[in-house]
């Protein structure tokens, strides 16, 4: 199953969404792709978002979605990935948009729940993940 959600607010909102997704996943694994929105918001909630993402089994972090903004040094998708309290084998920063769906599909198995969270164009990737998974059957 592939599920998408908006999580551009504080880490507590992301944590609630992930806790609900964990219930939906049941005995399956929860695999999450996350794209933070705005550099200033990411800077403020970096640790909270990272902790929330730790509720997943596997996490793929994209670069911050911040069109027209000036980057803040030290605030990035890579910095977000470093905040996720999971074994490094289960957290990846994927800077290449075209590789994200494949990363998620590679991690997913029967009964798993793949969830996209964040703002920007992350929600567009769900159909691509489903297509890859169908082709692999």
Regions found by a protein language model. Give the residues of each.
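ATP-dependent carboxylate-amine ligase
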Residues: 1-137
């Amino acid at each position: 199953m592939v599920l998408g959600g908006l999580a551009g607010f504080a880490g507590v909102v992301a944590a609630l969404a992930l806790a609900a997704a964990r219930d939906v996943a049941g005995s399956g694994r929860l695999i999450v792709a996350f794209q933070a929105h705005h550099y200033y918001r990411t800077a403020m909630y970096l640790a909270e978002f990272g902790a929330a993402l730790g509720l997943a089994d596997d996490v793929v972090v994209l670069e911050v979605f911040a069109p027209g903004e000036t980057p803040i040094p030290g605030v990035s998708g890579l910095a977000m990935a470093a905040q996720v309290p999971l074994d490094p084998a289960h957290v990846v920063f994927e800077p290449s948009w075209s590789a994200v769906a494949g990363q998620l599909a590679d991690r997913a198995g029967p009964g798993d729940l793949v969830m996209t969270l964040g703002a920007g164009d992350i929600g567009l990737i769900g159909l691509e993940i489903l297509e890859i998974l169908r082709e692999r059957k």
